[in-house]
A protein has these predicted regions:
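Sec-dependent N-terminal signal peptides of Gram-positive bacterial secreted proteins and lipoproteins
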Residues: 4-21
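A composition-driven surface/loop motif
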Residues: 19-249
């Protein structure tokens, strides 16, 4: 059953409009289908202030706002250690089969999908870790004009303090029924963004503990127990009213 609405979100004192489509059908990210199409060796440019071992890549630029372009296949963890670093994925397949985050950001980081590129960030494997495929201890910006698939087989797709989505690309995020596609303190989309964001097969599509401000973008929510969730009880009631007012088609 397909449900569509223009969702009115009022978190704290902020009112905004965004197009959100809710669908009960299942749509999943196939992380095996295209893996062999990627270069077997990871490429990071520039190589300054980059340390590569067997299963860990550490990126620690001297200056903020430094951009690193990553291409190819890597099984392990990329650790971003400097504030305001920009990671541009250009046909990259980053996975961690040791059940840890594929990309871990110790400071505020931007993850951007390059134009016309298709990229994967995947966390899987056995173990007791319940983290996310893309994880930040601080703020996280996700954007670009390419395609980005994020899948967390262990718990969440994306986890950060504050999450901001921007750009004009296609972003697919999948967690588990024990976690969220996106979990954070605050979730923000500014005006004028044209991206498509697909939130798939999780307990919560977006779980924002403190606030949610969505002013633009297109959201497609497939097979999540709760589409949008905040810990503010009054705002949960607003969201419930919006969902009850869906036009069923």
């Amino acid at each position: 059953m397909k449900k569509s609405l223009v969702l009115i979100i009022s978190i704290i004192t902020f009112l905004s409009f965004s197009c959100v489509n809710v669908n009960s059908k299942k749509m999943t990210i196939d992380t095996k289908k295209d893996k062999n199409l990627y270069e077997k060796k990871i490429s990071v440019f520039p190589m300054e202030n980059v340390e590569i071992s067997n299963d860990v890549i550490k990126i620690f630029p001297q200056k903020e706002n430094t951009t690193y372009t990553i291409s190819g296949y890597f099984n392990g963890q990329i650790v971003v250690m400097k504030k305001n670093t920009i990671i541009k994925l250009n046909n990259a397949f980053i996975e961690n089969t040791s059940s840890r985050a594929a990309i871990k950001c110790e400071e505020k980081t931007e993850i951007s999908a390059a134009k016309d590129s298709v990229n994967y960030v995947v966390s899987s494997g056995r173990g007791f870790f319940t983290n996310a495929a893309l994880q930040s201890e601080r703020d996280l910006v996700i954007g670009g004009s390419g395609t980005l698939f994020i899948r967390g087989y262990k718990c969440h797709g994306v986890e950060a303090e504050d999450v901001k989505i921007k750009g004009s690309g296609d972003i697919y995020i999948e967690g588990t029924k024990a976690g969220s596609a996106v979990t954070c303190d605050s979730f923000t989309v500014e005006e004028g963004k044209t991206f498509n964001c697909y939130l798939l097969n999780s307990k919560n599509g977006i779980k924002a503990d403190e606030e949610m401000k969505i002013a633009s973008g297109n959201f497609y929510i497939f097979n999540n127990d709760v589409a949008l969730k905040t810990d503010d009880e009054s705002e949960n009631k607003i969201q419930e009213q919006c969902l009850l007012a869906l036009a069923i088609s």
